[in-house]
């Protein structure tokens, strides 16, 4: 099992420093992406086109951070040829930056919708749903990054588990908004913008789950991607929760 002390166990202090540096760069990128999501949701709800424009301007900075971290990972792989937990750390970082960059892309899409709605000048139906789901997704991103910083597989598991709640609430909100558009066709254009913003939030939740799965891989050494939640819980907690899955008991199927 890996923890923060694992980053300082190498004979080469330079290798220790390189691992800690690339990890800190990932977390710095994560902090900027987290702020980008916060600002995008706030800009949409409060009709703040200036804040939305700031979110869009940060996107290139996020892209550059992704490129820089990729280069660091390649350099470490080439020079140090890491193995075991060190290799898992580099793999987890190199994959997590992809999800962070895509979270930034989704935040930028929300910001674009915010600017569009500001130009139309009327608050559409659906802001309650945006605020509610937005708060939950922001918490998921924060917890996924905290789990990475603390090498906390249990916290990472809770993020993966919560993604199902986001998916369920997104579908509920979508049904309500479609019904509203059918009742008031004049609202279609504006409400569609809110629906696309909600879709971006749901995708951000998916990317937060991806990062949490990488944390579990990093800490436990088990690739839990594409696992159902029962089996993933068993891997993290070391229990036999997956027995029902293996036996294929009716009514015990587990959605991802």
From Swiss-Prot:
Q: Which GO terms describe its molecular function?
A: protein homodimerization activity
Name the Gene3D superfamilies for this protein: Phosphate transport system protein phou homolog 2, domain 2
Keywords tagged on the record: Cytoplasm, Phosphate transport, Transport
Task: List locations, semicolon-separated.
Answer: Cytoplasm
A GO cellular component annotation in the UniProt record = cytoplasm
GO terms classed as biological process: intracellular phosphate ion homeostasis; negative regulation of phosphate metabolic process; negative regulation of phosphate transmembrane transport; phosphate ion transport
* InterPro entries cross-referenced by the UniProt entry: P_transport_PhoU, PhoU-like_sf, PhoU_dom
The family classification in the record reads: Belongs to the PhoU family.
Quaternary assembly: Homodimer.
Q: What does this protein do?
A: Plays a role in the regulation of phosphate uptake.
Q: Which NCBIfam families match?
A: phoU_full
Query: What protein am I looking at?
Result: Phosphate-specific transport system accessory protein PhoU homolog
Gene that produces this protein: phoU
